[in-house]
């Protein structure tokens, strides 16, 4: 089945949305600015599939940017949300469910001794860096170019995700004062981190890093990079903050730390989580060492709060999702991700399209580049984004929904069945031909359309 390029219902909805919503969307990457055309307005999802406002079905390789690891409308999650809603949607009080969810996170991720629930990954990272500053009494945060930690002002400098998609170096509204205590370094450059600590180590409160950089496309840490950050933080009395909003409970039951730090014998001081832990509803968390978390109000002086933190519906969805994420689920997701990545790479190879496929666990992305490696933001930006746009639209027309940006990770779910994979395989050759037909000027700075 080939999906026509036109989408009258989505066209109409987008026109209506642009009158009342800035840019017509509630998060920039959804607007298709990087690939052109009209964003598809989705009305329902089931398993690995989405249905748009025109009634057309797509195999989904976005999975709500990661949370839908079990697929859409998983019966256990739907039942949990329905039952929770019947009991009341919000109380503004502690609930038994939030204790259970916190206990489950602490049980799965050993270095997390205490955890605080919030509503979004942005809240989690914002709170984690405030806590790190409050605990150490130091002002400076080190982050890495291309890593995205939400839209908190102090961390939006040289960020990935939508900032990369739109080709923005920074954003108006973030003042110099807000980022004055933020140092941005190239990702995977441990020597430069070491030099920075040597010069300013007594001012650095924390280093925050995505466990795997996945908001400039997927760029795994080089061997020893994360462990090196741990060593340098220890040597200078700084905290290491691991942003596992994307990888947490997605690449394994214990997140990326379980695949790397747990094996190598080191751990961050603080973690941030989101996406999968909310089961598709707004939920996130930050947690870590008990002595650090003890500085949070009301136990300590570092203030953090939220009216809807620990919302009963989000907690119920998160509990149902995490409980359903068995070792078998992770094995299935890993296998399906490898299948899809292999199909796409084979199709591009057959058409002679230069590309690089990066992966970390079940996260992967395709860079349209002739480089032999992409290890940082500068390398991620040197790709032919016009080819990605052509590939994207051909797949979309064939009923496969990809991330509408070359700077985002691709996701599969445990619900991606043989039929879904076969549809991807059927669509990939034509998409590769479409990419091959496009010239390859290198896009530096996001390639916004």
From Swiss-Prot:
Catalytic activity: (S)-4-amino-5-oxopentanoate = 5-aminolevulinate
Classification via SUPFAM superfamilies: PLP-dependent transferases (SSF53383)
Organism superkingdom: Bacteria
Reported cofactor(s): pyridoxal 5'-phosphate
Keyword Mitochondrion: no
NCBIfam families for the chain: hemL (TIGR00713), PRK00062.1 (NF000818)
First-listed, main subcellular location of the protein, grouped into a coarse class: cytoplasm
Keyword set includes Hydrolase: no
Gene name in the database record: hemL
Protein name: Glutamate-1-semialdehyde 2,1-aminomutase
GO cellular component: cytoplasm
Extent of the signal sequence: none
């Amino acid at each position: 089945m080939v999906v026509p390029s036109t989408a009258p219902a989505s066209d109409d909805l987008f026109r209506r949305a642009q009158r009342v919503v800035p840019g017509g969307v509630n998060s920039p990457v959804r607007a298709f600015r990087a690939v052109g055309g009209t964003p598809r307005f989705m009305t329902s999802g089931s398993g690995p599939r989405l249905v748009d406002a025109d009634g057309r079905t797509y195999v989904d390789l976005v999975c709500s940017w990661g949370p839908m690891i079990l697929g859409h409308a998983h019966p256990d999650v739907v039942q949990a949300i329905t039952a929770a809603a019947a009991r009341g949607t919000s109380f503004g009080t502690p609930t038994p469910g939030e204790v259970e969810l916190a206990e489950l996170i602490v049980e799965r991720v050993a270095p997390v001794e205490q955890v605080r629930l919030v509503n979004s990954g942005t809240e989690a990272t914002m709170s984690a860096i405030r806590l790190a500053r409050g605990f150490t009494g130091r002002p400076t945060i080190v982050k890495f170019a291309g890593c995205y930690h939400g839209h908190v002002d102090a961390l939006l400098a040289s960020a990935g995700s939508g900032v990369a998609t739109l080709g923005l170096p920074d954003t108006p509204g973030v003042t110099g004062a807000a980022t004055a205590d933020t140092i941005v370094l190239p990702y995977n450059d441990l020597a430069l981190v070491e030099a920075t600590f040597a010069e300013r180590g007594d001012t650095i409160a924390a280093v925050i890093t995505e466990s795997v950089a996945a908001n400039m496309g997927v760029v795994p840490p080089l061997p020893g990079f994360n462990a090196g950050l741990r060593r340098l933080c220890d040597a200078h009395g700084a905290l290491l903050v691991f942003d596992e909003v994307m990888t947490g409970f997605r690449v394994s039951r214990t997140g990326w730390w379980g695949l790397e730090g747990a094996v190598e014998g080191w751990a961050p001081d603080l973690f941030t989580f989101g996406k999968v832990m909310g089961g598709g509803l707004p939920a996130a968390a930050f947690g870590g060492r008990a002595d650090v978390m003890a500085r949070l109000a009301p136990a300590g002086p570092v203030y953090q709060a939220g009216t809807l933190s620990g919302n009963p519906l989000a907690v119920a969805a998160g509990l149902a999702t995490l409980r359903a994420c068995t070792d078998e689920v992770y094995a299935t997701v890993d296998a399906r991700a490898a299948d899809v990545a292999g199909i796409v790479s084979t199709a591009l190879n057959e058409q002679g399209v230069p590309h690089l496929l990066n992966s970390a666990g079940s996260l992967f992305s395709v860079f349209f580049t002739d480089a032999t490696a992409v290890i940082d933001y500068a390398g991620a930006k040197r790709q032919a984004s016009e080819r990605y746009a052509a590939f994207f639209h051909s797949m979309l027309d064939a009923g496969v929904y990809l991330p509408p940006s070359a700077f985002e990770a691709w996701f599969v779910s445990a619900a991606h069945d043989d039929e879904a994979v076969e549809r991807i395989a059927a669509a990939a050759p034509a998409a590769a031909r479409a990419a091959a037909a496009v010239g390859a000027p290198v896009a530096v700075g996001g390639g916004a359309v």
